[in-house]
């Protein structure tokens, strides 16, 4: 059964929602599901913008058949070749043998690498700055390499001001009928997933996002809709969400606050983390988030690291090293290029306490533009009252560094 939504008078959402997939890219938990967005334009010529994951192909085909209502599909325009958006290309070609493909040189190379039989079809190769008309609608193409694949591009319908943004401005979460961001409480229900999406999907490539935003800045007044390949369509408050992407891709903190991530085997390091959180709140800093590194998926920790200005690493020493799950968190921060944060350290161990020095060395040597506070809380097995002064000094140092 078809499930479509009208975006503009001539444009329809023909994508699908997926609540069956547990791990996006087989890595990231998506308890709220995910959407695969595709769009169909009805003009003198008909155009399908991207396809969907193979698991949702039937839904796409039913949606497309309903919107076309007996018309032929004239063009398939492909902005991004990742299989969750391109897997149905060959099925579209089989069902619409006269369809013409529009994409760029690298995209056509990837189509052939994935084994799509496109050579029997007319392939129209475009590059940045080119325009193409489908009737009253004219589109122009903007390269978006490494946002987050090398072939990625975005397409602007200059007639209606619709930006087909590929994976940029996307988010985890299934739409379930609510296509537009203004139909949901985005800040309450979606922002965390958007922030979790960005660093893991495109966050390593912050400079490339900044380049795309710079390009978009020249036509920002023309953009009335943002149609990403995942998540809601934006038709209101576009500037608010663009500003979020700008903040995240510059690796600037979204808010002044403290993320406390602790690694605790028997609860003693956790107790110290709790004591620090309590002290910070007592001193007026209520924006404090605390997570057990062992029971929290690292993608959630990274999302919070992109949110907060200050990060406290509290780790027990394990085999004369950093606790393994904490080390994984550090490695992910490095891989995803997190920058411009202030760190504080709590270390613990019953003998040969090493975790603090090792965490500080990692932050200093492996991460970029980071500050580590001189104050450190060092514990021997557990936190006693004799350590209260050190803990309060650490809390004061964190708050002082925010001024």
Predicted segments — roles?
Residues 44, 55-102:
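Active-site metal-binding motif and surrounding structural segment of the metallo-beta-lactamase
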Residues 45-47, 75, 137, 161-164, ...:
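Structural motif
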Residues 49-51, 73-81, 101-104, 163-167, ...:
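Active-site neighborhood of phospho(di)ester-bond hydrolases with catalytic His/Asp-centered motifs
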Residues 88, 296-301:
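Short acidic active-site motifs
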């Amino acid at each position: 059964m078809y499930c479509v939504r009208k975006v503009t008078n001539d444009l329809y959402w023909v994508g699908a929602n997926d609540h069956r997939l547990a791990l996006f890219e087989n890595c990231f938990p998506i308890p709220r599901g995910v959407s695969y967005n595709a769009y169909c334009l009805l003009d003198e010529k008909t155009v399908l913008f991207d396809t969907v994951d193979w698991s949702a192909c039937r839904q796409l085909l039913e949606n497309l058949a309903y919107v076309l209502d007996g018309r032929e599909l004239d063009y398939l325009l492909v902005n991004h070749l990742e299989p969750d958006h391109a897997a149905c290309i060959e099925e579209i070609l089989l069902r619409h043998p006269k369809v013409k493909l529009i994409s760029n040189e690298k995209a056509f190379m990837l189509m052939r690498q994935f084994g799509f039989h496109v050579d029997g079809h007319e392939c129209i190769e475009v590059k940045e700055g080119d325009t193409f008309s489908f009737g009253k609608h004219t589109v122009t193409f903007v390269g978006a390499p490494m946002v987050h694949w090398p072939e990625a591009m975005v397409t602007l319908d200059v007639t209606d001001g619709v930006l087909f943004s590929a994976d940029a401005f996307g988010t985890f979460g299934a739409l379930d009928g609510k296509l537009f961001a203004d139909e949901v409480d985005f800040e309450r229900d979606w922002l965390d997933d958007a922030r979790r999406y960005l660093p893991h999907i495109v966050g390593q490539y912050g400079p490339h996002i900044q380049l795309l935003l710079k390009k978009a800045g020249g036509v920002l007044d023309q953009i009335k809709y943002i149609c990403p390949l995942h998540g809601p369509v934006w038709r209101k408050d576009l500037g608010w969400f663009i500003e979020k992407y700008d903040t995240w891709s510059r690796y600037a903190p979204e808010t002044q606050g403290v993320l406390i991530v602790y690694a605790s085997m028997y609860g003693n390091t956790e107790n110290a983390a709790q004591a620090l959180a309590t002290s910070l709140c007592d001193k007026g800093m209520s924006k404090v988030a605390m997570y057990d590194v062992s029971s929290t998926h690292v993608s959630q920790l990274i999302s919070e690291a992109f949110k907060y200005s200050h990060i406290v690493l509290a780790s027990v020493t394990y085999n004369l090293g950093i606790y393994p799950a904490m080390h994984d968190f550090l490695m992910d921060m490095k891989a995803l290029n997190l920058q411009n944060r202030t760190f504080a350290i709590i270390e613990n161990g019953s003998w040969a306490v090493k975790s603090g020095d090792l965490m500080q060395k990692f932050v200093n040597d492996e991460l970029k533009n980071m500050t580590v506070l001189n104050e450190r809380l060092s514990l021997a097995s557990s936190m006693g009252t004799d350590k209260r002064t050190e803990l309060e000094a650490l809390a004061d140092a964190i708050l002082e560094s925010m001024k």
